[in-house]
């Protein structure tokens, strides 16, 4: 008996949406399901008073990959937003990334030579030849002042551990700019889709049946019977019923509120780098689109989200894979099981247990499409 669909795609996020579009173009029949009540996965944006709110954390598209940029701009026009976060340390405001504005505020230096000399002086003072932990690694790269004010508290909140107890490899490099360039990402292409990410993903899924609020793993046999092959973008350990144990994640909790004012902090992202403030950062969503609605009108209200890093436990929303040896070894075991599933392709952030920027997810999905669809 032939199956009703060529492909079942589990998950309507970016990875799934790329495959859906390519499969449809190749003349394949596709059914998409997602256990959430909405499409777009973690890039989902919802309209609140004309503001596109990034419900699962800020997503700023940036890439140097021309193929990916040309691909994604078929589904949305992108604005010219560039990410220039601000760091708030006990009310002192600093520019991120670390640049001449940062160094001037920190030490009163004016020229690049003075800034470079100050950083070198602090690195020499520390005298760390072989960093044994994250604290020593950061100080060996940028000196103690920047570490204490802009790295230490933020990192400890993010990881829930002291910097002395975190491995040095977490910070491989800290970009230091001896210019006044405030653009956080050194990417050729950057922006936010006009109208929000949800609209963009809807364009990718156009013309394909999508069923929301459907948990694949609860009805696996029923759904597997519908399609020749499955593209699975959920957690790989959940697919195998956690038989080897749980892969660990870091999670994030958001407190989002609508405020009856037009401007809360004057920037899309403000990082709180002291240890005492419980949140890691505040996102003010309207500034991703310059404070305007889709028609270009000024928005009278604003929406902010306070972000808190939290320890993940089974059942929580998985955000960031914990890429340590223990979890890497466990993922390898699940990967071996996955390779035996000849009718299932595992992909995306959760399916591959990998921290992916959006452009890398799209590139990975396009590579898979070439192999799968020819």
Model segments located where?
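Mid-domain catalytic core of redox enzymes
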Residues: 26, 216-337
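Short catalytic/ligand-binding loop motif for oxyanion handling, primarily in non-cytosolic enzymes
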Residues: 40-42, 95-96, 147, 158-163, ...
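Short, well-ordered alpha-helix to beta-strand connector turns
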Residues: 5, 27, 208, 226-228, ...
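Dinucleotide-binding Rossmann-like beta1-alpha1 core, especially the glycine-rich loop
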Residues: 49-124
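N-terminal Rossmann-like FAD-binding beta1-loop-alpha1 element of flavoenzymes
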Residues: 5-32, 369
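C-terminal catalytic lobe of FAD-dependent flavoproteins
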Residues: 317-374
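Active-site/ligand-binding neighborhood in enzyme catalytic cores
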Residues: 90-94, 100-229, 233, 238-240
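Glycine-rich FAD pyrophosphate-binding loop
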Residues: 21-49
């Amino acid at each position: 008996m032939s199956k009703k669909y060529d492909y079942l795609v589990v998950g309507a996020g970016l990875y799934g949406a790329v495959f859906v579009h390519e499969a449809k173009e190749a003349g394949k029949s596709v059914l998409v399901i997602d256990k959430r009540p909405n499409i777009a996965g973690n890039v989902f944006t919802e309209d609140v008073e004309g503001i596109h709110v990034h419900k699962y954390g800020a997503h700023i598209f940036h890439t140097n990959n021309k193929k990916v940029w040309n691909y994604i701009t078929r589904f949305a026009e992108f604005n010219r937003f560039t990410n220039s976060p601000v760091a708030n340390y006990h009310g002192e405001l600093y520019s991120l990334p670390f640049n001449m504005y940062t160094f001037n505020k920190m030490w009163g230096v004016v020229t690049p030579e003075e800034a470079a000399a100050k950083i070198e002086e602090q690195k020499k003072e520390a005298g760390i030849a072989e960093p044994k932990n994250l604290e020593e690694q950061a100080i060996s790269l940028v000196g103690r002042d920047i570490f204490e004010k802009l790295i230490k508290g933020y990192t400890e909140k993010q990881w829930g551990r002291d910097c002395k107890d975190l491995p040095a490899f977490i910070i491989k490099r800290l970009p230091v700019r001896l210019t006044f360039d405030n653009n956080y990402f050194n990417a050729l292409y950057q922006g936010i889709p006009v109208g929000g990410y949800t609209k963009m993903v809807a364009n990718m899924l156009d013309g394909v049946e999508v069923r929301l609020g459907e948990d694949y793993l609860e009805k696996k046999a029923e759904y597997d019977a519908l399609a020749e092959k499955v593209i699975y973008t959920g957690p790989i350990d959940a697919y195998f019923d956690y038989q080897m144990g749980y892969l660990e994640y870091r999670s994030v909790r958001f407190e989002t509120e609508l405020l009856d004012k037009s401007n809360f902090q004057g920037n899309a992202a403000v990082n709180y780098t002291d240890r005492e403030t419980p949140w890691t950062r505040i996102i003010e969503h309207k500034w991703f689109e310059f404070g305007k609605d889709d028609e270009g009108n000024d928005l009278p209200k604003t929406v902010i989200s306070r972000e808190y890093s939290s320890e993940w436990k089974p059942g929580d929303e998985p955000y960031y894979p914990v890429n340590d040896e223990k979890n890497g070894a466990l993922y390898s075991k699940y990967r071996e099981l996955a390779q035996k599933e000849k009718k299932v392709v595992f992909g995306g952030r959760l399916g591959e247990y990998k921290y992916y920027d959006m452009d890398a997810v799209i590139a990975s999905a396009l590579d898979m499409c070439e192999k799968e669809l020819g």
